[in-house]
Amino acid sequence: MKNSQDIRSGFKAQRYSAPALNIARCTLNVTRVLFIILVCLSATTLVYGQEEEGGEIESVEIEIVKVKQITMPKANRNFEKVPPRPADPLAPSMTYDFKSIDFAAPDYKPVVKPLRLKDETLSKIYGNYVSAGFGNYNSPFLRGSITSKRNAEKFYGVDFLHHSYGKGPVDGEYSGMGYSKLNGYLQGMGPKVTADLGLTYENMFNHYYGYPAPKPESADDIRQSYNILGLNAGFTNTKTSDFNFKVSGDFSYLDDRFEASESEAGLHFNSRYEVNKTQAFILKSDYILVARKDTKVEAKPRHLFRVNPAYEFTILDRFRLSAGLNAVVENDSVGKDKAAHIYPDAWIHTELAKTVDAYAGITGDYEKVSLHTLARENQWLNSNVGIFHTNKSFEFRGGVQGKVARKFSFHVGASVINYKHLYFFVNDPLDRSRFDVVYDNAVRLNLFGELGVVHGDKVNISLRGDSYNYSMDKLDHPWQRPSYKVGFYSSYKIVDKVLLTVNMISQGGAKAYDNEADKVVTLKSAMSLDAKVRYFISKPLSVYVEGNNLLNNKYPIYQFYQARGLQISAGVSWSF
């Protein structure tokens, strides 16, 4: 009990100040902690004792004595608040007066001045040019063109060309030749129709130098000259539309140095009507009138009328087809069984790849043959030769063409044509320097391949090869016609001011009949290698050096007509 009283007296309620109370609480907390530690130690001892003595609890008396008392002084508290700062009155006092203000601004009339740009200087157009040169074989060269510039409503101009050889491969002036052409043209463009008009004059002269020895007394005795005067006119729609057309007409008159003359007139119509993107109707038509006169040939009109309708359409978005016919009416007398001829005209095109197309088709036609045609192909014609149109009664043609890697293009194919009265050249038995014309039926197989390479403006190459095989009806051979042709054409821009062109032409396998030896001969293969280097002194002015037949081959053009050997020429060109 004494202990209990001591404990109670130690915790007698007293009034302490705040610091004293905090210290008392801290002391009490320490005392409690010590008490708990002692209890735990006692319990451990008791447990241990129980384990050793069999679990009996010994009676223990604990006495806690608190004798220390902490006394803290009383704290002084100040409960006085800070008074607010007095506000100073405004002097003078402010008054507010609100008034409505009407603001009327005048109408704004801006003056916009467009930006004045300097007039752009138009680049000079070098549409006119003149080129002149001279070479061995006494060969002057002159070529030029003068045209209008920057006119959206009309275009006109004049072209001229002269190239002659005063001497040739046989007896100098006895084998001279030349060609001249003067061409004037005018074109007017309206909003709906564009019309054009042209006038042309040509002169071709040569010598019959395929004579045997001795040579004639005068070169003028064997000179042949053709003069051709031509006129053409036409009109077409100016803007491309669903219906496009072109109508044209032409007239040409030819005479030679002797007594042959020929008039040729033609009317041509070409139209296309687009139904939609996959269908179209096409109509082509021609009428040609030819009249020739010679010492033994009376002027007789030869008519050739052709009409070719066709329908184009697309199926399966891949195949483009054209189905039509070609109807021809003519009045030639050779091999004539009927005046009217009808041929199928059907074609199919398909896309094998994005840039590769294949095509095939069958057709037929009548090919115009006149003195104009033969004289341009062979200037050593005899007088009074027979002239008839060629009936191409059947033709099949197919091939594949396309581009590879944008720089390479190719075209390979084959054609089979059945000709009726196809013309061939044979030497006159009485005068071997002149050629007669004979006709025969023939089937010709042509295999061809073409390759092109374009690399910007640096390189441009074209190579084509043709193989011909003839199956004749009556003639032993296709006289004077080659069995193969190879052509190589290229241009190279070596540097900015130097342009090189290299061309090569080769043909061979042609056969001819030698009347003097009474045997068939195979003409020597022809190969001509040509090169030209042009140096640009400035943009409008350049000079050139040209070499033809650089291999100096003495190959025959036709039997007894030898080609010129090495030819070198140089000249200057000026654009303005």
Q: Model-found features: residue ranges?
A:
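N-terminal periplasmic/intermembrane-space "pro-region" immediately following the signal or transit peptide
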Residues: 48-120
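Transmembrane beta-strand segments of Gram-negative outer membrane beta-barrel proteins
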Residues: 90-110, 116-136, 153-160, 241-247, ...
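Outer-membrane beta-barrel translocator/receptor signature
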Residues: 110-113, 121-130, 134-170, 174-182, ...
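Exposed, low-structure sequence patches enriched in small/polar residues
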Residues: 125, 130-133, 320, 324, ...
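Residues on the lipid-exposed face of transmembrane beta-strands in outer-membrane beta-barrel proteins
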Residues: 144-148, 158, 184-188, 231-237, ...
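Surface-exposed extracellular loop regions of Gram-negative outer-membrane beta-barrel proteins
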Residues: 148-168, 280-284, 300-332, 456-464
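Flexible loop and strand-edge segments within Gram-negative outer membrane beta-barrel domains
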Residues: 165-181, 196-246, 250-264
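Outer-membrane beta-barrel transmembrane domain signature of Gram-negative proteins
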Residues: 221-234, 248-319
